[in-house]
Amino acid sequence: MKNILPLLFISSSKLMRQKTTITSAVRIALTRYHVCMLAALTFFLLTILSNAEVNAKGAAMHPEEQINFVKQQLKNKKEPYVKAFKMLIKKADSSFHVSHHAVEDFGVPGFYQDKEGHQRLSLGLQRDGISAYSCALAWKFTGKKKYAERALYFLNSWATVNKKYSQLDGSLVMSYSGTTLMIAADLLKDYKNWTTPDRESFNLWTRNVFRHAANSIRFRNNNSGDWSRLASLLANAFLDDQEDFQEDVRLIKKDFFNKIAEDGHMVEEVKREGNGIWYTYFSLAPLTASMWVIYNESGENLFFMEKNGASVKKALDYLLYYNQHPQEWKYFKNPRVGTVNSQYGFWPANLLDAMSNIYDSNDYRQYVAPYRPLMYVQHDYAWTFPTLLPLSLDGYKEIK
């Protein structure tokens, strides 16, 4: 018995030491686990906060940094902002004298099959859209309730009346003319008097009609695809549908270097005979606007993508040169060019005005300088108020 007790004591001591060792190991493992979980949780929260910060900057097309920058210029009575702002307010005020043109079936025949019918049936959406857009911006700058309410009048009209789109160009026109409704809605997101039922109604219309129209043609590799992707991006930003938003981004990247040649010409658009320069603009305007929306929503910068010399900058330079030297355009004799007297507005000046700060281009600035402030308020809506609302990739630290 005397011999057994020491052995039991020794065994018990070993067991206690082993138990202590095991307990320590478990504690270390649990500590490491908690540290890892805490790190993962921290990363997750930071990601959410980071995304929230991006979205908190404001609308997809007009981030708060941009709005605040312009407010400061207006406060300082700086031109051309003051004059451009007066033009905006005049446009917004004109919306109080017109009724909405929403229709149950937005049916638009093909332009080349029925030009008169196409233009007539498109005009209602174009007038309502620019009215909503200009009023939403006017509210953003002035805080006056009447502008927000007038913008909502047009948004609610389309959300409750319009149920579908049809005919050959219904989806395309809704994409390039209806962008204004989406931008207006995005600007009004923080308007407290936009009731929940009305918001839900507009969300439903955006998802089932507007975005459906855009997504039905976003696979196209020409200007139609460019406009429909912009429309879809704006809808997805408003709906906070990140999955479909990323699908738009994927499509833009997928055919980017198929549509822009190494010398800068737009492969599909120069085929349009006498309208080749116009369609070059008509493709680049929504493409660059899409890049701006992507940058504002995700922080991803696509403006400087380049491959074998092909880039958006080169395409813009190409457009500017041949709009000034149409006699050198090799694809068609006497092509249509954009001027200050153009039917819808001064294209491509509105586009080049918008891009002048993105690419810090004195050529673009010199081209548009005599005509500023520019406003493009008919037909197609990517760069509508380029002088009033300049773009910046550096937080508006340097605007020329």
Map each language-model feature to its residues.
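Glycine-centered signal
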Residues: 10, 14-15, 49
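Bacterial N-terminal signal peptides
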Residues: 36-48
